[in-house]
Amino acid sequence: GMLMAATALLAENARPDEAQVKDALGGVLCRCTGYRKIIQAVMAAHDFDAEPLRAETGSAVGTRLNRLDGEEKVLGTDLFGDDVAGQGALVLKVIRSPYHRASFSFGDTGGLLVTTPGLIKILTASDIPGRNLHGVIPDTVDQPVFAVAETRFKGEAIAAVVGDADAVDKFDVSDFPVTWTERPAYLTPEKALADNAPLIHANRPGNILMNGIVQRGDLAAGFAHKDATIAEGDFITGFVEHGYIEPEAGLAQRVGDRLEMHVCTQSPYMDRDDTAAILGIAK
């Protein structure tokens, strides 16, 4: 995003000032940087037009490295998460809660397998051999792989059907044998923090994930400063979803005594550790 926005700007204006660079990059939201180095680099880009900066041969610092997947990416032949499954691979479809909060019970899941050709397995919490929890941050892991008896949010997973691709594709999730009982939901922080609100997790008193300390200086002295500008109001930011460039998909297969996964992820080592804990196997 940064490169595309900067390239578009430099194509129109080879020597932009800081305000112009900020304006051009303003639509690129990035949590990984303070923007300062990027802004400076775009403003200085014209200095390298005549003679590109090249590292000395054999220099460890500054030497340009070829990306392992660079050629495949450029040619469009690289394989993404939804491209790696071979012919005949089994496919999984997750059954999710249609309610914000509900209790549920399963019906005749064994009968579903008998009457639905191509389905070979139904997975529920009882099939989890290890820890029925997952989450990116180890200290706050509390999300079940499959909910047990009650779901806590709309879309929470309760089961998965596994089978050949055609059967799973045609399977209507409304045919899954489950009975739902919708329960009162608390959809705002204020309601969830109320004294009479039920606990989302038994180990989270008051429905509070964690407490922290924010330190600040002398607010009154700051406001009293002659150069201080005070702005008051209610400010709301919208929800921003990452713009994935591929489906969230992947492949898992057994290779010897190892489980090998090909998935799209930002945190492969955390995924590895989580999967090992869920399956009750060594990393």
Which role fits each region the language model picked out?
Residues 46-205:
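Flexible, low-hydrophobicity surface segments
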Residues 78, 219-279:
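Conserved beta-alpha junction segments in alpha/beta enzyme cores
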Residues 1-56:
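Ferredoxin-type iron-sulfur electron-transfer modules in oxidoreductases and energy-metabolism complexes
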Residues 2, 17-21, 34-41, 70-76, ...:
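General structural feature for long, well-ordered alpha-helical segments within catalytic domains
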Residues 17, 165, 280-283:
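Helix N-cap / loop-to-helix initiation motif
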Residues 27, 88-92, 116-120, 148, ...:
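Short coil/turn connectors at secondary-structure junctions
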Residues 111-114, 273-283:
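Phosphate/pyrophosphate-binding loops at sites that engage ATP/ADP/AMP, CoA/4′-phosphopantetheine
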Residues 29, 81-84, 148-151, 239-242, ...:
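A generic local secondary-structure boundary/capping motif
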